[in-house]
Amino acid sequence: MHVLIPAAGSGRRMEAGKNKLLIDLEGESLIYWTLKSVFSASLVSWVGIIGQPNDKKKLLNSVKKFSNEIEWINGGNTRQESVFNGLNSLPSNAEKVLIHDGARCLINPDLINKCALELEENDAVILATKVTDTIKIVDNEGYIQQTPNRQNLWAAQTPQGFLVKKLREAHEMAIEKNWKVTDDASLFEMLNWQVRIIEGNSSNIKITSPLDLQIAKLFLKDY
């Protein structure tokens, strides 16, 4: 299985002053732990990191253990552009791909394998968790307009897996139509293509705040 890891986190909300994937987490960089989990998945055979050129040296230095096993890919101005660059940098024999956020360092390798296996039967799959909070839809002035049934609500995570041919087609359509999305599954939705949900777990958080970092430290103490 081929895996692409967008790794251009600005670290603004972390107040880090650098790419948040370089933040120290139990003696290693955040991206180190992500790669450790990804390479622990037995079905993974190729990994590409998509980042900004000015981060390349520092990011690769922080994951020297994996330096011979990863490919560097220059990213674009947005996550969407970066993933498209990644798709165009895959080996010619790549038929399926998993896209995984660099900041989700607590991903369980078994869930990575599960996503890969589900692509045997589906064109697109994503990890997600059932929403447990009551969700409110509000207007621009902050007034509640609707309370959707949470039984039908899931919080999207990564990995998100796709047939390479279909995902590339979706990205090309997005360029043509000027669609802007925050995850790749949204492109399939806009094209009315099916995406299969795979239930993930609540520990697969995306590190976006100092609190998230403290939570990750607690999980990694026994890793």
Swiss-Prot record:
It catalyses: 2-C-methyl-D-erythritol 4-phosphate + CTP + H(+) = 4-CDP-2-C-methyl-D-erythritol + diphosphate. It comes from the Bacteria. The record marks 150, 206 as: Positions MEP for the nucleophilic attack. Belongs to the IspD/TarI cytidylyltransferase family. IspD subfamily. This is 2-C-methyl-D-erythritol 4-phosphate cytidylyltransferase. Catalyzes the formation of 4-diphosphocytidyl-2-C-methyl-D-erythritol from CTP and 2-C-methyl-D-erythritol 4-phosphate (MEP). GO terms for biological process: isopentenyl diphosphate biosynthetic process, methylerythritol 4-phosphate pathway. PANTHER family: 2-C-METHYL-D-ERYTHRITOL 4-PHOSPHATE CYTIDYLYLTRANSFERASE, CHLOROPLASTIC. SUPFAM superfamilies: Nucleotide-diphospho-sugar transferases (SSF53448). It is an enzyme of class 2 (transferase). Pathway: Isoprenoid biosynthesis; isopentenyl diphosphate biosynthesis via DXP pathway; isopentenyl diphosphate from 1-deoxy-D-xylulose 5-phosphate: step 2/6. Keywords: Isoprene biosynthesis, Nucleotidyltransferase, Transferase.
